[in-house]
Structures are given as C-alpha cells and as structure tokens.
C-alpha cells in the first residue's frame, strides 16, 4: 500500500519581485495559502507566490536537511540550475 509522504520541501516564487522562498511543511496547500494571505511574516510583503518546486520525504529529518541544504550557497546554485527552464521569470534572489 502506497502511503503519501508527509514532509514537503517547497520553493515559491514571488510574482512581486521574482525572488524565491524555500520552506518545509506537512501541509503544502495550507502553507501556500498562508504565504499568499500575508499571515506569514517572512513573506507578507512579497505576495503573491506561485509554487515552482516541491519534494516529498518520508522522514522529517530528511526534509529538514534538504531545506537547509537548499538555503546554502551551493544549494541555491543547484536549485537555480534545476529550475532555470521552468521558472515563470528568472529568480532575483533566494531567501527563506
């Protein structure tokens, strides 16, 4: 029986400034709504956001390690390379 993987690392792109936001959650749709409603302090001034990437993990530590890696300089470079063909607009910055 295939169970859905509970932990998600996600990347959002701001329609306002093109910047990317990297996060981790167990409920992607709820979290996206929070970012787009302005209830998330880290992204309130940069909304609206579009989901541009997500990965699911079986364990919380694995997801957290991936989130931390994507926020490093080498992780940001790897992410930009992965997403360069699919982003609606070039990323102006990476934050998270």
Q: Where are the language model's segments positioned?
A:
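GIY-YIG nuclease catalytic motif and its immediate N-terminal context
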Residues: 1-50, 54-57, 61-72, 76, ...
């Amino acid at each position: 029986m295939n169970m859905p993987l509970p932990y998600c690392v996600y990347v959002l792109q701001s329609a306002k400034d093109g910047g990317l936001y990297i996060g981790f959650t167990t409920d992607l749709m709820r979290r996206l709504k929070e970012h787009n409603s302005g209830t998330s302090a880290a992204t309130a001034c940069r909304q609206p956001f579009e989901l541009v990437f997500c990965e699911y993990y079986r364990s919380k530590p694995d997801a957290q390690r991936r989130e931390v890696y994507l926020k490093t300089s080498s992780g940001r470079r790897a992410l930009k390379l992965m997403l360069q063909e699919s982003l609606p607009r070039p990323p102006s910055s990476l934050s998270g």
